[in-house]
Amino acid sequence: MDFSIIQYSKFMTLLAMSLQNLKTLHMSLEESIKWLGEVMAEIGPTHSQKSEDWNIFDVKQANAIIDYLKISLFQHYKLYEFMFYSAREEIVIGTEQVIEVVKSACGPFPNPLEEGISFDIYSTFIEPPTILDTEMKRLDQEQGPEESQPETDTSDMDPLVGFTIEDVKSVLDQVTDDILIGIQTEINEKLQIQEEAFNARIEKLKKA
């Protein structure tokens, strides 16, 4: 059935009113059928003020609307009543997750939530100072600048003072020779092992 835009609007209004009567006014099936008959009876050749909102449908269209309401709303009226009136149990579907974290320790490793921080930043700004570090700082402050001055002077001294260039060269030559001799010995041992393995394979091939 082809309807115009205004007819579609009125038809949707009729459907909404039918559901509203069931949901709000708690009309029974007999009362809803009676109400629909009264509304459809207003569709006719008379053009009174009361029926001017519904007289846009002819008799054929009105019969099509009634047939549709029979197979949709009225046929499943009990189902609509159950949907509007019956209280339904709310089923909440959820899940529980148990997360076990590592217990904090006094070691050098940060807690699990702080593993993304570099160790330098963690040890400087987050990790509390240990008892040993606190005692060392306190002893350094008690000793004063007089005792720390010779250490500073000693650390500033050149470790090569008292050695000539020839002494340094001789030491470097000796260290280099020792390293090269060790490498050469290791290479010779590996070559000897490979040679023995090849000889053993050749002997097996000869016997075969």
Swiss-Prot record:
Pfam families: CLAMP (PF14769). Keywords: Calcium, Cell projection, Cilium, Cytoplasm, Cytoskeleton, Flagellum, Metal-binding. Its main location: cytoplasm. It is found in: Cytoplasm; Cytoplasm, Cytoskeleton, Microtubule organizing center, Centrosome; Cell projection, Cilium, Flagellum. GO terms for cellular component: centrosome; cytoplasm; sperm flagellum. It comes from the Eukaryota. Coiled coil: none annotated. Residues 143-156 have a biased composition (Acidic residues). One of its GO terms (molecular function) is calcium ion binding. InterPro entries: CLAMP. Residues 139-159 are annotated as: Disordered. The keyword Secreted does not apply. PANTHER family: CILIARY-ASSOCIATED CALCIUM-BINDING COILED-COIL PROTEIN 1 (PTHR28457:SF3), COILED-COIL DOMAIN-CONTAINING PROTEIN 189 (PTHR28457). Calcium-binding protein. May be involved in the control of sperm flagellar movement. This is Ciliary-associated calcium-binding coiled-coil protein 1. The gene is CABCOCO1.
